[in-house]
């Protein structure tokens, strides 16, 4: 398995703080995930809560089917940078948050609406898919 040799990295030339990512290792992992998706028929999504390094979005979007988000800003990041499907879920959304997040979503898991009743008709995702 190939990895970048970080022993040759000149740490004095890096800004501080910064993130240093082994893009070769990320791509290798994406290739594995893509193989799993192809072999199983599953759709694999990037969990933006866990890894939302948007500069790698073009690479990630070549291998995965989309992203999953738990809030408005993650959903916007998924829609604008990652492409593909955008799935959203949270245990609770305010009515105002729902109105902003649903136009960005291809799939939304029904959740409790704070400060109001859940209106299933309010779910107007571009994919119109609900569990």
Give the residues covered by each predicted segment.
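N-terminal glycine-rich anion-binding loops that anchor highly charged ligand groups
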Residues: 2-6, 27-52
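Generic N-terminal amphipathic, Lys/Arg-enriched alpha-helix
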Residues: 2-21
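Active-site-proximal beta-alpha core segment in soluble small-molecule metabolic enzymes
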Residues: 42-131
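Short hydrophobic/aromatic segments of transmembrane alpha-helices and their interfaces
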Residues: 9-10, 36, 59
């Amino acid at each position: 398995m190939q990895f970048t040799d970080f022993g040759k990295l000149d740490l004095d030339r890096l800004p501080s703080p910064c993130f240093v990512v082994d893009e070769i290792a990320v791509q290798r992992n994406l290739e594995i995930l893509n193989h799993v998706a192809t072999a199983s028929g599953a759709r694999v999504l990037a969990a933006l809560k866990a890894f939302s390094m948007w500069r790698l979005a073009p690479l990630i979007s070549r291998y995965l089917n989309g992203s999953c988000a738990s809030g408005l800003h993650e959903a916007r990041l998924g829609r604008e940078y990652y492409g593909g499907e955008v799935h959203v879920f949270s245990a609770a959304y305010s009515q105002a948050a729902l109105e902003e997040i649903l136009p960005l979503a291809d799939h939304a898991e029904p959740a409790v609406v704070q400060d109001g009743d859940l209106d299933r008709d309010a779910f107007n995702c571009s994919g119109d898919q609900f569990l």
